[in-house]
Amino acid sequence: MPRSLKKGPFIDLHLLKKVEKAVESGDKKPVKTWSRRSMIIPTMINLTIAVHNGRQHVPVFVTEDMIGHKLGEFAPTRTYRGHAADKKAKKR
């Protein structure tokens, strides 16, 4: 269920401070974060945010279409390598 509109978007304060600092300085370096639960807000547009996926930080370039989504949606945590091949079919 989506979050109530009267509550507003959730964003971790430490991430918000990092984003505001990056916007002020105009720094193009990725903002590193472990906060996958934070929502993307308009001040993050045109920033690269490195979101942790459990193993490494995945760079995510924020565009206007992403506003309202969570950061974790753009950094997949699971890798699919395909099902095991059928040994009988391989021999033929």
From Swiss-Prot:
This entry carries the following GO cellular component terms, namely:
cytoplasm; small ribosomal subunit
The record's Gene Ontology biological-process terms are: ribosomal small subunit assembly; translation
The UniProt entry, under InterPro entries, shows:
Ribosomal_uS19 (IPR002222), Ribosomal_uS19_bac-type (IPR005732), Ribosomal_uS19_CS (IPR020934), Ribosomal_uS19_SF (IPR023575)
The record's listing under Pfam families reads:
Ribosomal_S19
Q: List the disulfide bonds.
A: none
Q: Name one GO molecular function term.
A: rRNA binding
Q: Which UniProt keywords apply?
A: Ribonucleoprotein, Ribosomal protein, RNA-binding, rRNA-binding
- SUPFAM superfamilies linked to this entry: Ribosomal protein S19
Function according to Swiss-Prot or TrEMBL: Protein S19 forms a complex with S13 that binds strongly to the 16S ribosomal RNA.
The UniProt family comment states: Belongs to the universal ribosomal protein uS19 family.
Q: What is this protein called?
A: Small ribosomal subunit protein uS19
**Protein source organism:** Aliivibrio fischeri (strain ATCC 700601 / ES114)
